[in-house]
Structure formats: C-alpha cells, structure tokens
C-alpha cells in the first residue's frame, strides 16, 4: 500500500497500461482482460490487474497532467516494482496529415512544463524519449494488426487552456499532436529506469472542427488499446 494506491505488494503486474481517465481503465479491464481483480480505488483512480492472452497485465488511471500522473508512476515503480508503463490516452492533432482517430506513437515529447528545468536546472534542456524497443515493437505490432500509425514528436502542454502557445509554430516544426503527460512519463522513465511508451489516439484537431465525443473517447479507442496490449506481451 502506498499513499495514493491501496493495493498490496504483488497486486500489480510488471507491465501497466496507464490511461489518464479512470473510466478508460475500467473499460479496458472489463472488455480486454480476463480474470480481472480491482486493486485500487483511492480517489476513484481505478486500478485493475487481469490477464491478456494468458499474460498478467495491469491498468491504472492516472488523472490529467504531469503532476497527477507523476504521483502514480512514482508509487507504481518505487512501491510496487512496475517495470514497463504504456500510456494510452487521447491527444489533439496538430500536423496536417493527422486526423481524428489516428494512432500516434510518441517517439519523443517536447514540453513547456518546468519539470525538466526543475530536474536539471536552467540552461539544460533534456529531451525525453520513449524506450526504443517498445516503440519499435508497437510500430510492427500495429502493422501486423493492419493499423496505420504515425511516429514522431508529441507536445506535452503544462496547461490545457493556453492562449499564448503558438500552435502554428509547433505544426511547422513537425509536432504530431498535443496532450499533457508524455514528457513527464519519459523523464521519470529515465530517472527511475523503467521502460515507457505513449500510444495516443487523436480525439480532435487543433486546426479543424472534427472531434470525438466524450463517450467515444472512453469506449471506442480500441486500436490504441489493442496495439498497447499486444506490445506488452510481445516476446513473452
């Protein structure tokens, strides 16, 4: 048991899928895993452990933004020995060739969050990156499933509502999409020495009107979930 997780040691698998939305965690557990056990309910940040094709997998809701997510990552890794974390979440599409429901694999994550500066000090701009083996596996798994993915840089915003941010410049520099977590995930992976990858579904477009409904975000991002689960068990 930790401060924000009321599970026991051994309740979590070595690999955890980490959606921000606790209801998405519940959806994954109920629709993709077998022999499911709920292992966390503190603050309604639901956590579950079950089996996927005979392999033990956990899923844990982490909330919105780097500060909330960092709490769960630190406790999962430090207190429960988790070795691999795959973020499954939504993002806003930025690049011209990105469309709603596209699946993005975050090779790296730029950010305007102070988390990297607070870690390394001013003047050093750390570049948070995914685990290459996980990234490569996810890309090839998606191909075998017939799911097209786009691989590249994701922008992890410190604020959801940010009128000062120059989205056109992000687009010009090839940023695929924006969310609020991946840079923190990759930074903590480097610090705590676990494997990490963000697999994201585009829920809306920054430069367009197309968007997925809240219900669709919760229940129909199955391509992202299938890629993540197959990546989690690859080679086991």
UniProtKB/Swiss-Prot annotation:
InterPro entries: DeoD-type, Nucleoside_phosphorylase_CS, Nucleoside_phosphorylase_d, Nucleoside_phosphorylase_sf. The keyword Transferase applies. Catalyzes the reversible phosphorolytic breakdown of the N-glycosidic bond in the beta-(deoxy)ribonucleoside molecules, with the formation of the corresponding free purine bases and pentose-1-phosphate. This is Purine nucleoside phosphorylase DeoD-type. The record marks 217 as: Important for catalytic activity. A purine D-ribonucleoside binds at residues 4, 179-181, 203-204. It is an enzyme of class 2 (transferase). It holds the Pfam family PNP_UDP_1. Phosphate binds at residues 20, 24, 43, 87-90. GO terms for molecular function: purine-nucleoside phosphorylase activity. Keywords: Glycosyltransferase, Transferase. Belongs to the PNP/UDP phosphorylase family. Transmembrane segments: none annotated. Homohexamer; trimer of homodimers. It catalyses: a purine D-ribonucleoside + phosphate = a purine nucleobase + alpha-D-ribose 1-phosphate; a purine 2'-deoxy-D-ribonucleoside + phosphate = a purine nucleobase + 2-deoxy-alpha-D-ribose 1-phosphate. It comes from Limosilactobacillus reuteri (strain DSM 20016). One of its GO terms (cellular component) is cytosol. The active site is at 204 (proton donor).
């Amino acid at each position: 048991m930790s401060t924000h997780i009321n599970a026991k040691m051994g309740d979590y698998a070595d690999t955890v899928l980490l959606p921000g939305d606790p209801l998405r965690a519940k959806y994954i557990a109920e629709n993709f895993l077998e022999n499911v056990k709920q292992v966390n309910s503190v603050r309604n940040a639901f956590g579950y452990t079950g089996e996927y094709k005979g392999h033990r997998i956990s899923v844990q809701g982490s909330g919105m933004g780097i500060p909330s997510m960092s709490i769960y990552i630190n406790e999962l890794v430090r207190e429960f020995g988790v070795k691999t974390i795959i973020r499954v979440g939504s993002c806003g599409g930025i690049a011209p060739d990105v469309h709603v429901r596209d699946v993005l694999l975050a090779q790296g994550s730029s950010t305007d969050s102070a988390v990297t500066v607070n870690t390394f000090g001013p003047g050093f701009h750390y570049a948070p990156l995914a685990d290459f083996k996980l990234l490569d596996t996810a890309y090839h798994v998606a191909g075998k499933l017939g799911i097209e993915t786009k691989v590249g840089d994701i922008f992890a915003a410190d604020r959801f509502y940010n009128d000062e941010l120059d989205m056109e410049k992000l687009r010009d520099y090839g940023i695929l999409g924006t969310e609020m977590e991946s840079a923190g995930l990759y930074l903590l992976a480097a610090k705590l020495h676990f494997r990490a990858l963000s697999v994201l579904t585009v829920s809306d477009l920054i430069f367009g009107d197309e968007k997925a409904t809240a219900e669709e975000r919760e229940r129909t991002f199955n391509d992202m979930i299938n890629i993540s689960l197959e990546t989690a068990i690859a080679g086991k």
